[in-house]
Design a protein with these regions (language model features):
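Short, low-complexity, polar/charged sequence segments that are solvent-exposed and flexible
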Residues: 17-20, 91-93, 120-124
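Conserved P-loop NTPase
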Residues: 99-128
Length: 128
């Protein structure tokens, strides 16, 4: 679900970035609505979204996860502590819904992996 054309870089409905074969891109659609639409009509194995943050988006993520769909999503923040200060996101990370948190920066170029944290094992795999 590419609400702001940040994942596939779509232009006139065509992905400009290689997001893989057998990938459908729903662009310029609010994430909460897009998630519900693809759940009802596409039977996805995985849903990827750009950054989440509001209660409607988080509710849609719970619906997808409860339906057995795997998720890859982003959250913007300065640190894990910054993100955990946001009530909605803290609930997501405190639950058993996500397994890993990957902290990225642009230190060595966009997408530099700084840290990987396993939420279930409560340990850092990389970076600490």
């Amino acid at each position: 679900i590419d609400e702001r054309n940040e994942i596939a870089g779509s232009y006139m409905g065509v992905a400009q970035l290689d997001v893989g074969m057998r990938t459908d891109v729903m662009e310029t659609c609010p994430k909460d609505l897009g998630i519900m639409m693809v759940l009802r009509s596409m039977s996805p194995n995985v849903i990827v979204t750009d950054e989440i943050g509001n209660e409607k988006e988080i509710k849609a993520l719970y619906t997808a996860l409860n339906g057995g769909v795997s998720l890859i999503t982003t959250v913007h923040g300065d640190s894990i502590e910054d993100i955990l200060h946001r009530t909605e996101l803290k609930r997501l990370l405190d639950g058993d819904l996500f397994r890993k948190v990957i902290i990225l920066s642009s230190r060595n170029g966009p997408g530099t992996i700084e840290k990987i944290y396993d939420l279930q094992e409560k340990r850092w795999y990389f970076g600490n």
